[in-house]
From Swiss-Prot:
GO biological process: photosynthetic electron transport in photosystem II
The protein's role, per its UniProt record: One of the components of the core complex of photosystem II (PSII). It binds chlorophyll and helps catalyze the primary light-induced photochemical processes of PSII. PSII is a light-driven water:plastoquinone oxidoreductase, using light energy to abstract electrons from H(2)O, generating O(2) and a proton gradient subsequently used for ATP formation.
UniProt protein name: Photosystem II CP43 reaction center protein
Propeptide regions on this chain: 1-2
Gene giving rise to this polypeptide: psbC
Recorded topology in the membrane: Multi-pass membrane protein
Keywords: Acetylation, Chlorophyll, Chloroplast, Chromophore, Manganese, Membrane, Metal-binding, Phosphoprotein, Photosynthesis, Photosystem II, Plastid, Thylakoid, Transmembrane, Transmembrane helix
Family note: Belongs to the PsbB/PsbC family. PsbC subfamily.
One protein family per Pfam: PSII
Assembly and oligomerization: PSII is composed of 1 copy each of membrane proteins PsbA, PsbB, PsbC, PsbD, PsbE, PsbF, PsbH, PsbI, PsbJ, PsbK, PsbL, PsbM, PsbT, PsbX, PsbY, PsbZ, Psb30/Ycf12, at least 3 peripheral proteins of the oxygen-evolving complex and a large number of cofactors. It forms dimeric complexes.
HAMAP family the UniProt entry points to: PSII_PsbC_CP43 (MF_01496)
Keyword Membrane carried by entry: yes
Amino acid sequence: METLFNGTLLVGGRDQDSTGFAWWAGNARLINLSGKLLGAHVAHAGLIVFWAGAMNLFEVAHFVPEKPMYEQGLILLPHLATLGWGVGPGGEVIDTFPYFVSGVLHLISSAVLGFGGVYHSLIGPETLEESFPFFGYVWKDKNKMTTILGIHLILLGAGALLLVGKAMYFGGVYDTWAPGGGDVRVITNPTGNPATIFGYLLKSPFGGEGWICSVDNMEDIIGGHLWIGFICIAGGIWHILTKPFAWARRALVWSGEAYLSYSLGAVSVMAFTACCFVWFNNTAYPSEFYGPTGPEASQAQAFTFLVRDQRLGANVGSAQGPTGLGKYLMRSPTGEIIFGGETMRFWDLRAPWLEPLRGPNGLDLNKLRNDIQPWQERRSAEYMTHAPLGSLNSVGGVATEINAVNYVSPRSWLSTSHFVLGFFFFVAHLWHAGRARAAAAGFEKGIERETEPALSMKPLN
C-alpha cells in the first residue's frame, strides 16, 4: 500500500514501509511498539488533565458569585459544586477556594503525566515486553488482554467508590431535594436494595419511564455507585484470575483494532446516556448549577404567572383559557391536577421547588392558594427566563421573551456535545469494527493503489 509519491517520509524513525501506516495514521504506527504507545497514551492523559486544570482555573478567574453558574458559561464548576465543594443552602457559592485547589492539583498532575509521556515517547524502551514483562503485551494474547480489562474494571470500580466515600464520609454532596431549596448533605443511608437499583435498568427508556435517567434522589444515585463499584471490582478480579471461555475466544476478534472498536462503541453508549442524563435529570445535575431542564423552565413559567395572577385576584382553580381548557390548572388524562396551557405536555415534571405543592392527586389547590414560599417564586421566575435553549452563535434564551438573558445553558452545551461526540464515536466504532473483522477474515488489503491516477502524475513541485 502506497500513499506518498516517493515513500521516503520519516516521522520519528517510524516510516510507512516499516509500519504500513503513513504519518497521519498517528498511533496506528505504534501498534506493535508497546513502549511508544504507552508514551502516546500518557501524553494524551496529560493533555486531558491539563485542559481540566487550566479550564478550571479559567472558570474560577471569571466566576461572579452574584450570578448563577449556568448564566456564566461554566461547565466545570457546576460539577465541583454538585460534589458539595464551596456551596451552601440553595446552591449559593460561599467559597471558591476548593475550585482553585482543584485546578492547581490538575495542573500539577498534568505536568507529571506530560513528563511521563515525553519520556516514554522519546527516551524509554520502544517495547516493554523484554524489560518489563508485566507491562508488556501481545494483542493476540487473550489471557493478557482480559487481565488488562480486569485492571481497568478495578480502577473504574474504585472511582465509583470514591464518589460513595465523598457522599457518605467526606462532607457529603449537594442534594437539590434538601428541604428549603437544596443543600449539601451527607448521604447516611444509600439505597442497597438490588430491586430498586437494578429496577432502573429494567425500565423503558421511553416516555415517563426514563430508564436510569429517571433517578430522582441522592440515596439511589449513591447506592447505584456502591453497587457498580463492587460489581466492577468483582468483575475485574474475575477477569484477572480467569482465561476467556471457548465461546468468547471464537466469537470475538482479538486484535488491537478490534479492542479500539469495542472501546469506541462503549464510549458511544456512555455519551448518548450522558446526553439524556444531563438534559432531563435535575437530581444528578442540579438546576441550581446547570440551569433548569426544558420541562422545568416551561412549568416554571406557568407557575410564575399563576402566582402573579392569583395575587391580582384571579381564581386560578376555575379560570378558562382561550381553548376552553383551564388557563392555570387542568386535569391530566388520568385525573391529576396539572398546570394548564402549553406546558400540559410536561405535566410529569418533578422539581424540588414544585413538589411541596403537590397532594395525593396532583397539584393541591389549597397549597397553591396558601403555602407558596418566596424561594419557590424566586426560583421559578429565574428558571422561566433561563430555558435551556441556544444557538451556534451563543445567543440563548427564549427568542420572544423580553426578560430573557443572552446565554447558552450548560445543559444545552453538555447534552449537544455528548450527542455529537457520541455519534462520531459510534461511526468510528463501525469503521474500526469493519476493518478489524475484515483483517481477521483475511481480505483487508487496503485500497488498491496500482491504478491510482495520481501515481502517474508529476510531483506538485
